[in-house]
């Protein structure tokens, strides 16, 4: 869903100047860098969508009045997709100072500028919006759902973690194979963060997919539960049938007719429930009455088996019976 979120954020209009500055500062910090070209400082930002590049150029022009250029790098080699390079050359140093990429002494700022780090909650949201547009990703809802931003260094990552904390969202900074990442994994936290940065339509789509997945997961759990119950019922029916068959072999005709009739019903309708067996009886019986008669039949047979010194009905229930149950 990364492209969906970035497309929506690229079209979002922000009115407050402090928020526009914070967003640009984060976007340039997470997507760009400072270069010395011909003795002058040049600001560059490498972005993955044309809409994001257009947004950055528009903001630089409207907020600071600086012109910029854009170069398109086609996919190929190590580049898996088209990249857009936004470059400010003539006014690069002024832009770097204005956005906090350089401090008052002209030294590069490794994290986010102080005015963003100590700013209000709206500045924190703007910084996250800029960082996500620059180098963010959002995975589909699921067990491993995450909202991530790849950071240029640990200082910028920690600054972004702090910005999330000011919005009441828990984010973590992690070093993954030498690359600093800021990660939000909790589904509710991701939803809150999408709301804060202004991705409301994307949030609705993400929550809908999340809900669909939860419904499917619940349905699967219930299906598995039903399957387990069916397997248990099948195994119980197989065991009951085997014991009844053994009981009738042990007793022969030396058992009350009503008990033998219940046993025959069990053997003739092996998969039927006790309630169904009761309905098949003549006259009809309750399921408790059927269960009681079968129980007495088995007890009578076990008593006879013990007296004769032969295996009782439980001995007829072997593991082989359950191979297909």
Swiss-Prot record:
Domain of life, source organism: Bacteria
Listed GO MF terms: DNA binding
Transmembrane spans: none
Keyword Cytoplasm: no
Segments of the chain annotated as binding DNA: 273-306
Keywords, comma-separated and alphabetical: Cell cycle, Cell division, DNA-binding
Protein's GO biological process: cell division; regulation of sporulation
Keyword check for ATP-binding: no
InterPro entries (alphabetical): Homing_endonucl (IPR027434), Sporu_reg_WhiA_N_dom (IPR018478), Sporulation_regulator_WhiA (IPR003802), Sporulation_regulator_WhiA_C (IPR023054), WhiA_LAGLIDADG_dom (IPR039518)
NCBIfam families assigned to the protein according to its UniProt record, in alphabetical order: DNA_bind_WhiA
Assigned protein family: Belongs to the WhiA family.
PANTHER family xrefs: CELL DIVISION PROTEIN WHIA-RELATED (PTHR37307:SF1)
Role this protein plays: Involved in cell division and chromosome segregation.
HAMAP family found in the cross-reference section: HTH_type_WhiA (MF_01420)
Name of the protein: Probable cell division protein WhiA
């Amino acid at each position: 869903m990364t492209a969906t979120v970035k497309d929506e954020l690229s079209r979002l209009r922000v009115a407050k100047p402090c928020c526009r500055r914070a967003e640009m500062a984060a976007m340039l910090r997470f997507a760009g860098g400072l270069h010395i070209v011909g003795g002058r400082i040049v600001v560059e930002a490498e972005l993955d969508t044309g809409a994001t590049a257009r947004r950055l150029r528009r903001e630089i022009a409207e907020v600071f009045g600086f012109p910029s250029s854009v170069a398109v790098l086609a996919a190929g080699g190590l580049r898996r997709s088209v990249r857009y390079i936004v470059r400010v050359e003539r006014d690069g140093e002024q832009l770097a100072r204005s956005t906090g990429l350089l401090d008052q002494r002209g030294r590069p700022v490794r994290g986010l500028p102080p005015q963003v780090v100590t700013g209000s909650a709206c500045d924190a949201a703007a910084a996250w919006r800029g960082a996500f547009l620059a180098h963010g990703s959002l995975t589909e809802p699921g067990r491993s759902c995450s909202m991530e931003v790849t950071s240029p260094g640990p200082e910028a990552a920690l600054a972004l973690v702090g910005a999330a904390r000011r919005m009441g969202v828990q984010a973590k900074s992690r070093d993954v194979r030498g690359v600093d990442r800021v990660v939000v994994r909790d589904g509710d936290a991701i939803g809150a963060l999408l709301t804060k940065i202004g991705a409301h339509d994307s949030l609705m789509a993400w929550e809908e997919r999340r809900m669909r997945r939860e419904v499917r997961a619940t349905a699967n759990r219930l299906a598995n539960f039903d399957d387990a119950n069916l397997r248990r019922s099948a195994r119980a029916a197989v065991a009951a049938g085997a014991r009844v068959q053994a009981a009738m072999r042990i007793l022969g005709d030396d058992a009350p007719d009503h008990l033998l009739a219940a046993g025959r019903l069990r053997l003739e309708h092996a998969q039927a429930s006790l309630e169904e067996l009761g309905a098949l009886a003549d006259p009809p019986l309750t399921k408790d009455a059927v269960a009681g008669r079968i129980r007495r039949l088995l007890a009578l047979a076990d008593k006879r088996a013990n007296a004769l010194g032969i295996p009782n009905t439980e001995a007829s229930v072997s593991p082989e019976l359950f191979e297909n149950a």
